[in-house]
Regions:
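C-terminal alpha-helical cap of glycosyltransferases
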Residues: 479-492
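A donor-sugar binding/catalytic signature common to diverse glycosyltransferases
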Residues: 202-231, 382-427
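C-terminal subregions of glycosyltransferases and related glycan-biosynthesis enzymes
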Residues: 2-115, 159
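Donor nucleotide-activated moiety binding/catalytic core segment of transferases
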Residues: 185-201, 207, 361-404, 437
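Active-site and donor-binding regions of nucleotide-sugar-utilizing enzymes
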Residues: 135-295
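Conserved catalytic-core segment of nucleotide-activated headgroup transferases in glycan assembly
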Residues: 145-159, 274, 287-369, 443-445
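Nucleotide-sugar donor-binding/catalytic module of glycosyltransferases
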Residues: 1-6, 405, 486
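Catalytic binding pocket for nucleotide-activated donors in carbohydrate/polymer assembly enzymes
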Residues: 370-374, 401-474
Length: 492
């Protein structure tokens, strides 16, 4: 706020040192005029502080009286109107001129950009259309996949309420095939904006777009996408790779969530804190984990192995690492360098095992498994990680929340935490003590990973009691009926 006074003081002082018709004075005046029409004008229109429309507007009027005449003649039509308003002290003319100018700029931007045009249509047209009472819109991971809890809620609705609902799925791949009668729309297209405006129900596993404005009659179900291990949102002291306004944005977005799913009591308590959420918490378990409790899960796993080309005579090791907050290309695009020595794993375990690789959807780097064909299978692009759990005999992870879900299977887990101290103490911090509460050992080298896998029997015995305690704490709500409970609560 003090910069205005400093700017005027600097201008007046500099102008007093040079001749009125000099080139330097002409330059100073051009800078002042640009400041007035570009920056100051916006303050007249948008600032909550009336000082911009009173004392400062009058001060600018006095400055304009001494601006070089040639500049006034060369100015644009908009600038001339603003100068006239300033010279005459006509605040209403100034506000009107600025409003029209900003609207013109915005409209030009809309015409040049499809996304902006779609947002404009959403705000001014689609959001005012009659609500489609039985339309349900689903989105997972920004349209990257048909997966997670929205998938299982969708399939439960489609199977148990045939013909009742119209289903809209946000998927960026138009070739994606959906079961039942779901309609695919691409994220941020005109159709996407339309259904944001008219759908009655929303089932998202991530935050909604910032420009979305939930209508009073609409129902927003936020499933989220994992039991929290790493500190989230308002529990983070510093947000490394996200937008500087991340927390402010998050606060506004969570205000529109009518329901939030919790997979366990631990998550319910954390979500209330880290999201500052005081809405309807559905303590149902995660619908995505219903698959892990099906009585025919082994038969499903066999068919999945055949579909993916995984050898039926080999055991499978799933390696599912998460991203590192300080290794990124930009917002939501993270680097990842594979630290697990796959060549050594193949040499030591290749006769009995194959490895399934699955990175987090935020990771932008593709994994290179050249030369490891028929041993390492990169399933990072496979939509549904829950299906990958089913075909995995062992899970290796780090700080990913996958282990909370995988524990439903009560199969062995290893935690390859080669950078534990950095991740825990510098980057994020954890909600649980990884050294005393995890249902498996922390390992720091590929050699340790191999040793633990070769000695699974003793490993299982060593961690049996801790695993049982972990299961009771984090998996006891998940009995295969979470989707049913969610649907009964939300789709009344």
């Amino acid at each position: 706020e003090n910069k205005f006074d400093e700017f005027l003081m600097a201008y007046r002082y500099s102008a007093s040192l040079v001749a009125p018709d000099s080139y330097i004075r002409y330059y100073l005046d051009s800078k002042m005029l640009r400041y007035y029409t570009k920056f100051f004008a916006r303050k007249i229109r948008r600032s909550k502080d009336d000082i911009w429309r009173n004392e400062r507007f009058k001060a600018m009027g006095e400055i304009l009286k001494n601006i070089h005449p040639r500049l006034l003649n060369k100015s644009s039509r908009y600038s001339k109107k603003m100068i006239k308003a300033g010279l005459n002290g006509d605040l209403e003319l100034a506000k009107k001129t600025v409003s029209r100018h900003l609207a013109k700029i915005k409209f030009k931007k809309i015409l040049k950009n499809k996304n902006e045009m779609n947002k404009y249509l959403y705000r001014h047209k689609y959001i005012n259309k009659p609500l489609e009472e039985n339309t349900v819109m689903f989105e997972t991971f920004m349209g990257k996949s048909y997966a997670d809890s929205p998938k299982y809620i969708y399939e439960y609705l489609a199977k148990n309420y045939p013909g009742k609902y119209k289903f809209i799925w946000v998927l960026n791949d138009p070739k994606e095939k959906l079961p039942y009668e779901g309609k695919i729309v691409k994220r941020f297209t005109r159709e996407y904006a339309y259904y944001l405006g008219v759908s009655k129900y929303f089932v998202f596993n991530i935050r909604q777009p910032l420009w979305f404005r939930k209508r009073e009659e609409q129902v927003f179900l936020e499933t989220w996408h994992g039991t929290p291990l790493k500190r989230l949102a308002f529990d983070q002291e510093e947000v490394t790779a996200a937008s500087p306004t991340y927390k402010a944005q998050f606060y506004r977005q969570k205000q529109e969530w009518d329901y939030l799913i919790a997979p366990n009591k631990f998550s319910s308590d954390i979500f209330k804190s880290c999201f500052m959420y005081d809405g309807n918490m559905l303590e149902t378990g995660y619908p995505r984990n219903d698959l892990l409790s099906l009585p025919n899960r082994d038969a499903i796993a066999l068919e999945l192995k055949k579909k993916l080309g995984i050898p039926l005579d080999k055991k499978t090791i799933l390696y599912a690492p998460t991203w590192r907050d300080d290794e990124y290309y930009g917002n939501g695009k993270y680097k990842f360098k594979l630290k697990l020595d796959l060549d050594l794993l193949k040499q030591q375990l290749g006769d009995e095992y194959v490895v399934l690789l699955r990175t987090h959807h935020y990771i932008a780097d593709a994994l290179d498994v050249t030369g490891l064909e028929e041993f390492a299978y990169n399933l990072s692009k496979y939509d549904d990680i829950t299906e990958i759990y089913l075909i995995s005999d062992i899970c290796i992870t780090d700080y990913s929340s996958v282990f909370f879900d995988y524990a439903n299977l009560k199969r062995p887990m290893l935690f390859y935490t080669y950078d534990l101290d950095k991740y825990r103490d510098v980057l994020r911090g954890f909600y649980i003590d990884m050294e005393t509460e995890l249902p498996g050992p922390l390992v720091y080298t590929t050699e340790e990973v191999i040793d633990k896998i070769k000695n699974l029997n003793s490993l299982n015995q060593e961690y049996q009691q801790r695993y049982e305690q972990f299961y009771e704490r984090f998996c006891s709500w998940e009995d295969g009926n979470a989707a049913m409970r969610v649907v009964e609560a939300v789709f009344k």
